[in-house]
């Protein structure tokens, strides 16, 4: 085999940024490798209440032979249980009937106080956690409101252990806020006794800033009105309040089906929130020294009173406003408005995370947040492609132009002076190696700025230590994290709750699909039988070639080719994903399709993506895991997965998101997008596939199993149909190197080796390899013409 040939384009254009990229990649990898070793400092920023778990309450519960728990002794059924929508189990799990007349109210309430576990069509499951209750308090819900409304919604009595758990987790959360007001930092609370308790602590006493002798608490009111409208104004006479649902007040027979105590109390909570938003809340506060902010935050967490960060951006006169507004064409959908109301509920900007499905308009939410704050904005992305896409999103939805938006990547460094929005990547900010002079100047300017808002795209990918490094480099008043999948296969996702802020809002995928905001997707798992020769080798080999054998299965290749051909005839746009680069190249080259993977240059990526979007002759592209996140391809409506990263639930959801964008002008069918996973039968790939599907199944999606593709056997145009062709493919797979058998490693992943790094590589080859005959190329080295030389120098060189 030997190393692949290097094209003239790679040799000429690739060297320009090669050293710079390698240095950045090594720095990125080092940061993430450091994150794997968790030390004591990792848990310093987490309150003790966050470690509490409601599931410990049911350790003594009796179970039957099938493992079902008997909760009858703790949950007494109420007489009117048929009119109430949910059960609250002693282990903190909550079950909601989605067909209940008060489903909408109960759903909004549960999203605020709990984490969704599983949301199929009829019964939804949620889970009360310490973090979810922390998030509930942060958006204004009080302990007694949570307890009282749960009691009114529940079909049974609430177990005492759950009530105690809620009180423990919400007792001290949300009582104290850190506010930047008139360019000064204040610790603010509506509860004077809480501030008195804080000031008894010697560490916080030293951080207090006293302007005059005998100064007591500063009295004040929360005088900022809630921002309830974003984007396009409503027509005269219209209201932005949701209209009451007649079905919520009446049953099928026209009689009142909903107990009055539910609707009355919900209206009471709404009224209380409105009153708070109308700025009549009395507060007390004291000023603290700016240089002591980090010390105060850490100490408040230790004494179980974590500070909620809020930015009073309308009273910030130190940082100039930037001239940016939403365009009239930017109309927000209801769920986008709801998520932003959670962020700007009391006229200030709360830091936190918003979770929306891929294709549901996360970028527009980020752009709207920046237009609302109207201060300098910093947007952090995963890749250079997403930097370009964010720039286009700002130009599409807002009045920002090229002069206001600055890109800062290894290949595009715009001049930052005078710009109001900087878009860059995480690796550019956290890079520790030597930079170019131009990059050094931009970094110095970036660090000197006081950013009003920092938007973190795909926030779930940020390891804790790496994000902490971003926080130490960048000064920002408000942090907004955006993601579609707030989950990781490790437990580090919980760190985001206190590094950024609580989860502010999470949308329901199936509801958005029913309303047409995202595509209606048919998910299918295609079973591909292993050919006898491939399966024999699969059973006998004990090396990493097992994975390559089931990915390169001839039956899988033929299924992929058949599906591509079928959907191209329909006029569909298809993306084929493969984590394994050896398979990616082989499939793409054999089918004569363009492909994108790690080493593909930025310009080539953009060219391929533009052709895919606008060229009717390019209907299929092959991509590696580089396209898992931040690739905006609204035209794609078919996705075929031939190789994946083990049992990663997050990757499955992110890939589905590539085709989730609502389809304009689609044929009126039951489904307008298709997601295929090709799986080799009787291999470990089937086990991985089951694990990967868990998250999407919990969102309400179902997978159709296809064991036979009708018409594939009679199609003579498909490759690898004969035993001879399959034998040649098997020899190609067996002669592949160990490196070819591995999945692609991207910067930031364990085991990533930057291109050009040293180290021995094991390869399989013939005798010609030993003589250096593999992939030999002729190359001329020409000396640069240095022009005329002075006679004096000629004399010395002679």
From Swiss-Prot:
EC number(s) stated in the UniProt entry for this protein: 5.6.2.4
Keywords, in A-Z order: ATP-binding, DNA damage, DNA repair, DNA-binding, Helicase, Hydrolase, Isomerase, Nucleotide-binding, Nucleus
Residue ranges with Acidic residues bias: 33-42
Residue ranges of domain Helicase C-terminal in the record: 558-713
An annotated Gene Ontology molecular function: ATP hydrolysis activity
Residue spans of biased composition, Basic and acidic residues class: 10-25
Domain of life: Eukaryota
Region (Disordered): 1-62, 235-254, 746-765
Entry similarity comment: Belongs to the helicase family. RAD25/XPB subfamily.
Protein name: General transcription and DNA repair factor IIH helicase/translocase subunit XPB
């Amino acid at each position: 085999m030997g190393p692949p040939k290097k094209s003239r384009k790679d040799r000429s254009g690739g060297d320009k940024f090669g050293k710079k990229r390698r240095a950045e990649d090594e720095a990125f990898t080092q940061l993430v490798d450091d994150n794997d070793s968790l030390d004591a400092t990792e848990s310093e920023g987490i309150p003790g209440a966050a470690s509490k778990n409601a599931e410990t309450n049911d350790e003594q519960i009796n179970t039957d032979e099938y493992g079902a728990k008997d909760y009858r002794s703790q949950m007494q059924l109420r007489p009117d249980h048929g009119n109430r929508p949910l059960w609250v189990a002693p282990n903190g799990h909550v079950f909601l009937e989605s067909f209940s007349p008060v489903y909408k109210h109960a759903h909004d309430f549960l999203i605020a106080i709990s984490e969704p576990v599983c949301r199929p069509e009829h019964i939804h499951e949620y889970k009360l956690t310490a973090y979810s209750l922390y998030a509930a308090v942060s958006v204004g819900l009080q302990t007694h409101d949570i307890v009282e409304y749960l009691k009114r919604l529940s079909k049974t009595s609430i177990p005492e252990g759950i009530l105690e758990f809620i009180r423990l987790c919400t007792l001290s959360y949300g009582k104290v806020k850190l506010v930047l007001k008139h360019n000064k930092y204040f610790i603010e609370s509506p509860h004077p006794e809480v501030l008195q308790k804080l000031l008894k602590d010697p560490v916080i006493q030293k951080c207090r800033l006293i302007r005059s002798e005998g100064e007591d608490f500063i009295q004040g009111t929360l005088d900022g009105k809630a921002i309830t409208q974003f984007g396009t104004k409503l027509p005269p006479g219209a209201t932005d309040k949701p209209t009451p649902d007649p079905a919520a007040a009446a049953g099928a027979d026209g009689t009142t089906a909903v107990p009055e105590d539910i609707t009355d109390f919900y209206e009471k909570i709404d009224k209380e929130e409105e009153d708070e938003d109308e700025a009549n809340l009395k507060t007390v506060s004291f000023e603290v020294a700016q240089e002591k902010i980090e010390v105060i935050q850490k100490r408040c967490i230790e004494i179980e009173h974590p500070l909620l960060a809020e930015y009073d951006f309308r009273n910030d006169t130190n940082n100039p406003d930037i001239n940016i507004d939403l365009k009239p064409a930017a109309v927000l959908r209801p769920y986008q408005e709801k998520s932003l109301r959670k962020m700007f509920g009391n006229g200030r900007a709360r830091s936190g995370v918003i979770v929306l499905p891929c294709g549901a308009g996360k970028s527009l939410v980020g752009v709207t947040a920046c237009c609302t704050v109207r201060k300098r904005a910093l947007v952090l992305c995963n890749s250079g492609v997403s930097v370009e896409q964010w720039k286009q999103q700002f130009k599409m939805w807002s009045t920002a132009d090229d002069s206001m938006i600055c890109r800062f990547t290894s290949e595009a460094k715009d001049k930052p002076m005078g710009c109001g929005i900087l878009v860059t990547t995480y690796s550019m900010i956290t890079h520790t190696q030597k930079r170019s002079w131009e990059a050094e100047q931009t970094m110095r300017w970036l660090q000197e700025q006081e950013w009003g808002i920092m938007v973190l795209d795909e926030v779930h990918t940020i390891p804790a230590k790496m994000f902490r490094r971003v926080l130490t480099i960048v000064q920002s008043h408000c942090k907004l994290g955006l993601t579609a999948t707030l989950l990781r296969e490790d437990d580090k996702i919980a760190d985001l709750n206190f590094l950024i802020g609580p989860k502010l809002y999470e949308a329901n995928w199936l509801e958005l699909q029913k309303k047409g905001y995202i595509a209606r997707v048919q998910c299918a798992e295609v079973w591909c039988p292993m050919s006898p020769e491939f399966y024999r080798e699969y059973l006998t080999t004990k090396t990493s070639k097992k994975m390559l054998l089931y990915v390169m299965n001839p039956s899988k290749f033929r299924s992929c080719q058949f599906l591509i051909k079928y959907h191209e005839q329909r006029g569909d746009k298809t993306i084929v994903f493969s984590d394994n680069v050896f398979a990616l190249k082989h499939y793409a080259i054999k089918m004569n399709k363009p492909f994108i993977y790690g080493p593909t240059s930025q310009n080539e990526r953009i060219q391929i993506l533009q052709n895919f979007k606008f060229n009717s002759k390019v209907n299929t592209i092959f991509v590696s895991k580089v396209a898992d996140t931040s690739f905006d391809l609204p035209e794609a409506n078919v996705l075929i997965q031939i190789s994946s990263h083990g049992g990663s639930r997050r990757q499955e959801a992110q890939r589905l998101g590539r085709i989730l964008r609502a389809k304009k002008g689609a044929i009126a069918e039951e489904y307008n997008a298709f997601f295929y996973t090709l799986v080799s039968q009787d291999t470990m790939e089937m086990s991985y596939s089951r694990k990967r599907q868990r998250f999407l199944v919990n969102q309400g999606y179902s997978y159709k199993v296809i064991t036979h593709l009708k018409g594939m056997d009679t199609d003579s145009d498909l490759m690898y149909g004969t035993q001879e062709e399959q034998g040649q493919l098997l020899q190609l797979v067996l002669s592949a190197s160990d490196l070819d058998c591995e999945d692609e490693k991207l910067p930031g992943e364990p085991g990533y080796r930057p291109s050009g790094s040293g180290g021995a590589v094991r390869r399989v080859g013939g005798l010609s390899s030993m003589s250096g005959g593999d992939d030999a190329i002729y190359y001329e080295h020409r000396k640069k013409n240095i022009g005329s030389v002075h006679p004096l120098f000629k004399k010395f060189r002679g």
